[in-house]
């Protein structure tokens, strides 16, 4: 086992003893990697665990800075890299198998690395970090430097891999994107180039994307202006405009899940939607592979999306969530799926070994399988993961060979302590919480969430079994603790009960009783010494409200199991006075506390402050709560809440905390003598620990990192070991008899039938639970009752038996009450529905009745609240509508109807103009007035300059001036057809409106809109005034009709006609305020009348009746009513109702009448006749009056209807004017909007141009730098090549002193090179490995060079020396040859670097050209946009009024093409035609009148010809006399009306040109200065080099002279002279050519200057923008 060499020196001073990590058990949460063909590794907590798949041997590497982050391995170099999780994390690179640190990489990442990946060949490591940098970095991990990095904010990546065949390609994929990054290198410079893959749509089809920046397919609109891209319409001008797409244009794409590379540098991508994609690595072209469906599809499985992919020959291996591995056989563009392997769990990761003979399969639980090709068995489980992290651990007594672990799902494992091999497993199939092993027997207790305790027998380690189950309560078990001698088992539950159970299996784990403590139990501590017969128990609980902790202590005698009935009551509760229960409180909160073995001392770990305190218990007894004060306080030097444990002999205090450090302290001094950092604070430290009885074995369990660490002592001896070993021996001797007895009982105890499961059954059950979690298995089992409820029921039974008589009496009373209630229910059934009570009212359950009553009250209150809220919402909505549509209206909307015809006229509802609108209108009006005054002043100034004409005009007659003024006014007011509306018909002033042909600027259009809105407001106001007048007139007419109807009703009543009286009324549309008032008849609900209202109505009715009685008693009034109908004077209207009473004698026959009576009868008839005549006369007068009144009503109402019809026409015209003005406003608003879009587009193009220019400067700088580097490298290459040639040519000169034949032999040996034997790979391996031999890299080149040097050592051996050669000469020859070989290698390497740099330069040049093309394209787009903008500003949209039926077009094509069409008024054409016709008629008449017209014409033509000839003669004479030269400037001066403005413009252009030339000149001067400075430095360098060369030249001349003497002496001619002569001739020729090129360059520069001067002279106004 090896650990990291760097470990933080903690703040603890360890003494002579120290701890070390023996092994670590944990299961992978990240992907498992191969280090070599036989070793895999994975991170777990603070460690990296290496496993040999053949021997299953583990090796551990510990991270010095906490939890291991991400990890990657490099198989060729056998190194592993991982990051830590601290702030500003580091990357560590370790070699394997030595586990020595190679390097430490430090970047600028703030939080965490998320991905690491090694290149398959070379020393490159790629790292990726997410938030907040989103940075991809490339490292040279051997030299610990970052080669290049790039940040892309917002891009989250979940997989990263290098191309196995090309280290320059890197693929990054996420659920939404796939990108291929290319690494480009030039000498020592590296850079990233990213390209994104265009993914298909979800259905596998491809979407044709258009260019967002420069769209080419936009339609052309000749009427409404240019059509711009969507980004310009949206107003985007930044980078977001380059990728902007509206929501309607966004389509869901495929979601990649995994990718893998192929030997052809292609990519296979698996998607969530089930598609398999193939991407070309060079072109990034995406191909959707077609799936070939089999005839018999796979049953009971539905493979949707691959979770992981690995490449194999002719296809890929993929896995999903169904636990199967599939083989994808790919041919061309289709693939077929076949079953490859079945795994018990869903597969999360797969990878091949480097030799491709082993396939590693990792499940979601963390288990690791190895599939070996061509061997039996093919599938082998390397790592069997547990079902979740370890919840609890404990040693099996005595703690030297085995230990147990428990997971939350109920999985119990027995492990071999030496190498952590799993011996056996058992599943409880329930949620477990705690575990404890019994010191006095081979058994263990497991607490569960449902309140049960399972007792496990581990007598047979390979097959543990449940021997007993105790269902204590329905509250979960949180603590299970054995005392030191294994007498009692104490179980703490969440509800605050501590159960005491007999720990002996022979007693069937008898439950003795329980005691109640505080609910939040933190720890239970016991002390059971060998020399005493009691067990002291302490329970620690927290009081979060008070910020304190409570200690509750009680004593249990060892004889308690025999006398348990006397210690507990009938319900099982232990009596506090018998167990001597005492309460203590501490003034501060503790996270843990243990009871010391001696001196009644307690040790506590403070949770708020980093201190460990000891407390002394009082010796005297006390009642109530006793406050403990700290006796000793020591700083723990551990942060976070911690736990305390005591060793078996009670002299070691072991502390663990959130920081992950375990400390062993002396119990007396509380000082640390041993410590170990086994976990880290990133994983929330240590959850629990266990120490064996002999103190030599320590198990530490992490809280969140899922690691179990086994610690051993490095040095364990002396007094430290003797104390605990002595106590261990005594304890074993004391427990030996009890252990033998209990173990024998456990060996004979049968297994309890509890629903347990084996490994395979548990796996299947787990899988079925995962697949369908909603299925419920119903079993007909009787519900089990907890022990505490059983005791309660037994106590209740005893109480029932004790009070049986009283119970009978109560039963009889209940029976009588039930009979009474039954009678009441029968009576209730006979009542009516209103009087009936509900069935629940007769229930005797008062609590139920109260509950139902409360529910009904709550329901009523809820309904009331809902109704109130509903009413409130409706009221609020009504108030909003009223405020918006009524109160805010300055002019309320209303209608006006005619009396007789169906005609309705509505007014214009209008809101009051705001203060801002009025201020804006005032500003525009003031501006218009100022402009008018300015225009008037300008006209006066221009007229004053004209001089004489102005004086003549002032002296003209007054009539002509008035006519001209009228004409001017008439001209200034535009006609309606040019104004575009009929607003002048309403008397609205339109003189301030600008002409529609002059609205070019944005401000003019805005001002025009404001004025048009004001015109609309005025038009509406004018009409509303007319409407109000008509409304008042109708009110007057209705009042007058109502007044006349009074008389009409009287006449009808007098005439006793049945004719109805027509009474006009205002309708609701005419008086809309009625809608806001709710009438009583509109309310459909029953009106609720309050009691005091009812009482008031009764009083009013009583007073009315009393008044009527008083009126009946008045005889005078009654007499008046009987005599004259209640009136004192007879009116004329009463004639019609007047009746003359008949005499009384008329009842007699005529024969018996007397004369007097006959005379009275005649008088009667005369009166009747007169009355009838008067009645007829009055009736006729009434009828005439009635007809007259009705006619007057008819006439007045019809007159009003006619007026309203005219008002309706006025309303139509006003609406027409309003629509016309609003149409103009809409056109202006559209032009403003289009202007904004054009401005946005122009800003975006300018910003885009700025970015491209910046990019161009960067690319130009990169090209310049690359070209300089290439030149330097080429120079070095030329030097090396020249040195190589010199070494080759000067070989014979070096060995000129030896004979010629030996020189020839040595030259052949000098040219000879060793053959390097390539390692031949086996044919089987070559056929299996799909990637074959990976391409070379820098490391491989170094290895090849080292191998070449090794082979050169063999050639340099003395045995290869030719015969007769001096050994000194041989050694000199070997050194020369080795130098030649090294130089050749340098030349090859430099040639490769040169080719790479040339390629890099070519790419940079291509990028520069591409950017330049983009810039030119942007310039072209800007020019087109500016042209469009100018065209849009000039081509105005105007509104012209046309008369219907007067537009005639013979050619319909004129409507389509507006290039030559002019729209004019028809009246102008007609007037012109009439004038032409009149003049033509006059001309014909004059020609007919004059007979000699033709002669006169001929005469005039002759005279005209004569005069022309004379003019020619005179002109010729004038030309002969004087020739006058007239230049173009003078012509321009005479022809140009504003020559000074033209001159000023040209001066401005020339100034700009001069400024630009000055700027360019300064820039050229600066460049020349820089060049001169650079040349000066270069000259100094050359002087120094020339001085060095001159010195060398002297030495060489001396050597040459010596050699000449030698050669002359030997009589042989040297070839050096020939070489020197040739070099001299070449040098002279080169110098001559250099001079010629300089002269030509000077001539070219002079010609360029002349060309530039001529160009500026020809085009002086072309200034660069």
Swiss-Prot record:
Q: What does UniProt note about where in the body, tissue by tissue, this protein is expressed?
A: Testis-specific.
Where would I find the WD repeats? 108-149, 152-191, 250-290, 299-338, 342-381, 385-425, 427-469, 472-511, 680-721
Q: Does the keyword DNA-binding apply?
A: no
**Gene3D superfamilies recorded for this chain?**
YVTN repeat-like/Quinoprotein amine dehydrogenase (2.130.10.10)
This entry carries the following GO cellular component terms, namely: 9+2 motile cilium; axoneme; extracellular region
- Which top-rank group of organisms is this from? Eukaryota
Which keywords does the record carry?
Cell projection, Cilium, Cilium biogenesis/degradation, Coiled coil, Cytoplasm, Cytoskeleton, Disease variant, Flagellum, Repeat, WD repeat
Give the record's GO biological process terms. brain development; cell morphogenesis; cerebrospinal fluid circulation; cilium assembly; establishment of localization in cell; mucociliary clearance; nucleus organization; regulation of cilium beat frequency
Q: Would the keyword Repeat turn up in this protein's UniProt record?
A: yes
Effect noted on mutating residue 347 to A = In SPGF19; uncertain significance
Report the locations given in the UniProt record: Cell projection, Cilium, Flagellum; Cytoplasm, Cytoskeleton, Flagellum axoneme; Cytoplasm, Cytoskeleton, Cilium axoneme
- Residue spans making up a coiled coil are 812-869, 910-957, 1154-1207, 1378-1429
Family statement drawn from the similarity comment of this UniProt entry:
Belongs to the CFAP43 family.
Q: What is this protein's function per UniProt?
A: Flagellar protein involved in sperm flagellum axoneme organization and function. Involved in the regulation of the beating frequency of motile cilia on the epithelial cells of the respiratory tract.
Task: Give the record's disease field.
Answer: Spermatogenic failure 19: An infertility disorder caused by spermatogenesis defects and characterized by abnormally shaped spermatozoa in the semen of affected individuals. SPGF19 patients have spermatozoa with absent, short, coiled, bent, and/or irregular-caliber flagella, which impair sperm motility.
Alphabetized PANTHER family for the sequence: CILIA- AND FLAGELLA-ASSOCIATED PROTEIN 43 (PTHR14885:SF1), CILIA- AND FLAGELLA-ASSOCIATED PROTEIN 43-RELATED (PTHR14885)
The protein here is known as Cilia- and flagella-associated protein 43
Q: Which organism is it from?
A: Homo sapiens
Encoding gene per record: CFAP43
